[in-house]
Amino acid sequence: MDQVIVKASDMGDEMQQEVFRIAEEAMREHTLEREIASVIKKEMDSRYGHTWHVIVGRSFGSYVTHEKGKFVYFYVGPLALLVFKT
């Protein structure tokens, strides 16, 4: 997997590392952005309870409200990933 570059986060290190591991596995198994997002969302819902939101893409803007400690925005290669819980 390409290097992870965190742009913004208020997530604890342990959960953040878990998000990176889930994303790595999803990106290894899928090439479509919506499929990568779906895998990450389902896994986060399963591990940490509902309701997680995941956006994966090369170019997008965002302005979201999230639970405290449940937000990370990062890049893996050319893909940006926004993962947060509401």
Swiss-Prot record:
InterPro entries: DLC_sf, Dynein_light_1/2_CS, Dynein_light_chain_typ-1/2. GO terms for biological process: establishment of mitotic spindle localization; mRNA transport; nuclear migration along microtubule; nuclear pore complex assembly; protein transport. Coiled coil: none annotated. Its main location: cytoplasm. Keywords: Cytoplasm, Cytoskeleton, Dynein, Microtubule, Motor protein, mRNA transport, Nuclear pore complex, Nucleus, Protein transport, Translocation, Transport. GO terms for molecular function: dynein intermediate chain binding; plus-end-directed microtubule motor activity. It is found in: Cytoplasm, Cytoskeleton; Nucleus, Nuclear pore complex. One of its GO terms (cellular component) is meiotic spindle pole body. Acts as one of several non-catalytic accessory components of the cytoplasmic dynein complex that are thought to be involved in linking dynein to cargos and to adapter proteins that regulate dynein function. Cytoplasmic dynein 1 acts as a motor for the intracellular retrograde motility of vesicles and organelles along microtubules. May play a role in changing or maintaining the spatial distribution of cytoskeletal structures. Also a component of the nuclear pore complex. Belongs to the dynein light chain family. Homodimer. Cytoplasmic dynein consists of two catalytic heavy chains (HCs) and a number of non-catalytic subunits which present intermediate chains (ICs), light intermediate chains (LICs) and light chains (LCs). Component of the nuclear pore complex (NPC). NPC constitutes the exclusive means of nucleocytoplasmic transport. NPCs allow the passive diffusion of ions and small molecules and the active, nuclear transport receptor-mediated bidirectional transport of macromolecules such as proteins, RNAs, ribonucleoparticles (RNPs), and ribosomal subunits across the nuclear envelope. This is Dynein light chain 1, cytoplasmic. It comes from Candida glabrata (strain ATCC 2001 / BCRC 20586 / JCM 3761 / NBRC 0622 / NRRL Y-65 / CBS 138) (Yeast).
